[in-house]
Every structure is written in C-alpha cells, then in structure tokens.
A protein has these predicted regions:
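Structural preference for solvent-exposed beta-strand-turn elements
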Residues: 1-190
Length: 190
C-alpha cells in the first residue's frame, strides 16, 4: 500500500523576517506571502518594506506591536538613502526599549529622532549611507539589536552569543556569501 501525506507547515517567522530584509537590501523581489500560513508579523514586515520606498516627508508606518519589524526596520531605514519615515506602533510598542540599537546606529552617523520618550518608539528616521565600521553593544536587551545591524552589513562586537544571532549570521552568509559573525563570544565582523 502506498500512502502520500502532504503537510502544509507554517513558515518560520524568524527566518522569513530576516530574509525579507536581506531581499529588500539587495533589491530582490520580496518573498510572496499568503494569507493562510504566513504569520501576521511576516505579513506586516512585508507590507512595510513594500510601502517604505514610496513614502516621503516623514510619513508614518504603523507596526502594531511587532518588535521584530520595529528593530529590523529601524536599521534598514537608517541606511536607506533618501528614506524619511516615522516608525510607530501601539501604546505597548512605545514601551519597548530600542535605545541600544539607536545609539549604535547614531555612532555610525544615522539620523534618528525620538518622537516621544527617549529610548523608545516612535522614531523619525532620515536614511543615509552609513559606514560599515564596527560597533559594540554590551549586554544587548534584545539579540534582535545585533541581528538588525548584521542584516545591514554592520560588524558588531558583543559579549553574548545566541542561536538567533547565529541564525542571522548563517542567513547573511548564505544570502550574500559574506561571513559577518564569528562565534568567539565577542566578535562579529564583515
């Protein structure tokens, strides 16, 4: 007896969100998303990435309470020349810290302004070309701060290791053929 079984598994939102940023950075068409098995966070990031190039004059992108989109888009928009956008979200999103990521991006010359409480969204970002020099994040409040920088090609040093940082490194390496992280517990390089 021959039996065939097809299972439609949901995609990994951790992988899909990273790939969406990498695709946008490299000018590739964004992964198609379906309404049936694509997590809401992935659809939200996909839609934001499609809209951002069309925006200007500080128009807002509402990211609900999606921390991944807020962190990854903060880095993405900061390095996107000509981008002029406000990233915002729910009241809960405006209580989620993002100061370490903004500080690291500002060290590279990013033009990011807090629209409310210092260290928290909403953020007004005016994108420009950023240098690819190393930054350090000590005890990051979120490994996504490190991943956001890695995704835009910024070398990072930190005192932590994480499977999510390792996943980002692997995806960047596979996507761009660059090794941007060394698991030495402290060094990430391009």
């Amino acid at each position: 007896m021959h039996c065939t079984l097809c299972i439609d598994l949901p995609i990994s939102k951790s992988i899909a969100n990273r790939l969406l940023i990498l695709q946008a950075l490299h000018g590739d068409s964004l992964l198609p998303v379906s309404a049936t098995n694509t997590p809401d966070d992935v659809r939200l990031l996909h839609n934001a990435l499609a809209r951002i190039p069309l925006l200007g004059g500080g128009e807002g992108v509402f990211l609900r309470n999606c921390g991944t989109a807020m962190r990854f888009l903060t880095a993405y928009c900061a390095q996107l020349t000509g981008c002029d956008v406000v990233l915002t979200g729910t009241e809960r999103m405006q209580q989620r810290p993002i100061g370490q990521l903004v500080a690291a991006l500002r060290k590279l010359g990013a033009d990011i302004e807090y629209m409310g409480k210092e260290g928290y969204p909403p953020l007004h970002i005016r994108g420009k070309k950023l240098p690819r020099k190393a930054v350090h994040i000590e005890n990051p409040q979120s490994t996504q701060f490190v991943s956001a920088l890695l995704l835009i090609g910024i070398p990072v040093t930190t005192n932590i290791t994480s499977p999510y940082i390792e996943m980002t490194r692997t995806l960047c390496h596979q996507f761009t053929h660059l090794q941007i992280y060394k698991s030495t517990n402290s060094s990430i390089e391009s």
